[in-house]
UniProtKB/Swiss-Prot annotation:
It comes from Anemonia sulcata. One of its GO terms (biological process) is regulation of signal transduction. GO terms for cellular component: extracellular region; nematocyst. It is found in: Secreted; Nematocyst. Its main location: secreted. Disulfide bonds join 4-44, 6-34, 27-45. Binds specifically to voltage-gated sodium channels (Nav), thereby delaying their inactivation during signal transduction. Thus it strongly stimulates mammalian cardiac muscle contraction. Keywords: Disulfide bond, Ion channel impairing toxin, Nematocyst, Neurotoxin, Secreted, Toxin, Voltage-gated sodium channel impairing toxin. This is Delta-actitoxin-Avd1d. It comes from the Eukaryota.
């Protein structure tokens, strides 16, 4: 997956660690969708 910004990472992608992973279909086991974006795209964070 592609790294994405979790809520716990901070308000901006600049200077922050991207601890989330962008998945196209849901989230892997042990992860949760941290943003309500599109139903087919999961902004997955631990």
């Amino acid at each position: 997956g592609v790294p994405c910004l979790c809520d716990s990472d901070g308000p901006s992608v600049r200077g922050n660690t991207l601890s989330g992973i962008l998945w196209l279909a849901g989230c892997p086991s042990g992860w949760h969708n941290c943003k309500k974006h599109k139903p087919t795209i999961g902004w997955c964070c631990k």
